[in-house]
Swiss-Prot record:
Protein name per Swiss-Prot or TrEMBL: Probable pectin lyase F-1
Keyword Transmembrane helix: no
Keyword Hydrolase: no
Disulfide bonds: C80-C103, C328-C336
Gene name of the record: pelF-1
Amino acid sequence: MKTATFSTLLALSASAVNAQVSGTAFGFAAGTTGGGSAAPETPSSIDELVEWLTDDTARTIMIDRTWDFTGTEGTTDGQCCSTRTTTCEGGTSAGQAWIQDTCDDGTWVSCTYDNAAKNPINVGSNKSIVGVGSDGVLKGKGLRITGGNSNVIIQNIHITDLNPQYVWGGDAITLDDADLVWIDHNKISLIGRQFIVSGWGKAGRVTISNNEFDGVTDWSAGCNGKHYWTLLLIGEQDFYTFSDNWVHDVSGRAPHMGTDMTESTIFFHGVNNYFQNIGGHAFDIDTNTWALLEGNYFESVDTPLTETSLTSGALIYNVPTVDSASACTSPLGYICEWNRLAGSGTWTERTDADVLTMASQYIDSLIDHIPVADVPTTVVANAGVGKL
């Protein structure tokens, strides 16, 4: 089992901080080097930024300011679909209208949305995209890794303001026919659709670590000021390490993984994440998924694990008892960490032994954990931008 504690990840020389990638990829994305030894470069214009992100050259691209794509590709005036998630009668926030071609269950309303947010930048292979201090922001534009591209690090940037008032307004990070991606120490907020989404193609080997997923919004499909579309992981053959993330003020898909619409297979190791203030559900797990969930802390989460997760055909090991924690010792070589709930809904016991059998095949990709009692303080102190 590979160890990836906060102390080892943050033990860097002063000269390295904010000058290049901080730390080393771990978990399923271990071996990801991004731009490798390429000298850090700072783009001077949006055009140069896009050119560097999309070309075939290994690069370390420093984001030292807010790159605002709003308006750079014009806007679209049209008709959006208004449903109950738009009108939000009795809700505590406005809703989201839907950018789509049909409106059988609602009424058409006039809408104007920004085009750039709906057209993500296709990131080439061998890229490190690194924010400087707390200054690195991509506004109005997401990133997509597709077409077989791989070996990408996205670290210490804030992706925000992608048509947040509209469903289908844009995704922050898309993985579709990709591999070896490390998404670390970022913040994502005010997104129209998914914070992170995989397409029908494989996302491959991915580590999502130390990120802040901030769902506070004035436009919510749940009508409660909390973003619904958090993470949708449905790729063809995917392996996820999801660790030390702060997921707060969302209302659904936090995360959703698996699908019965394809032959998708997913192994997901979720460890030491802090789920806070979730006015809906956190884990929603579908078929063809093996999920090992340990050391996660749920505070004020309505539904930590959906009921449909228990009947979908998903295989889940969620460490509900002392015995189930100790049962990890033989196949995995360590005692799993309990999950903890505070002011939250039910964490229904699931201990599918096939998950441990599957996990034993990937022992080198399983990461160490801290005590679950330390998760809220440690994660909040370290997750997000400006905390390398």
